[in-house]
């Protein structure tokens, strides 16, 4: 599991307005952490595009293998067990990964 990869994950059980269900997530934690820890830090994706500031909208392409446009929900960042990640479907470009890290830094200042 590497930074920038897109995986299907089981996110249940959840509390409140946390993103739930079997859904796509983007791994954002660094590769060294991913190599040694039993968890990864990730952002859930949604196909309900709201264009919130600080969220990246991904269009389907051959690299990410998405079937429809998806918004990365940076404000729903969470740590999940690697056991929750079930199937890798693709990855982000290097630029998209850099942008997500910048957006994460921005939401930490709000």
What are these regions (language model features)?
Residues 17-20, 29, 70, 79-81:
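Generic serine detector
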Residues 20-22, 27-62:
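Compact nucleic-acid interaction/catalytic patches
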């Amino acid at each position: 599991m590497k930074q920038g990869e897109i995986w299907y994950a089981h996110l249940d059980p959840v509390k409140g307005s946390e993103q739930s269900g079997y859904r796509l997530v983007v791994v954002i934690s660094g590769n060294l952490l991913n190599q040694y820890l039993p968890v990864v830090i990730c952002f859930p994706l949604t196909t309900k595009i709201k264009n919130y500031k600080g969220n990246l909208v991904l269009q389907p392409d051959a690299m990410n293998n998405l079937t429809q446009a998806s918004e990365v929900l940076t404000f729903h960042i969470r740590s999940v067990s690697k056991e929750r990640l079930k199937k890798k479907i693709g990855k982000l470009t290097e630029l998209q990964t850099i942008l997500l890290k910048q957006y994460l830094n921005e939401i930490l200042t709000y």
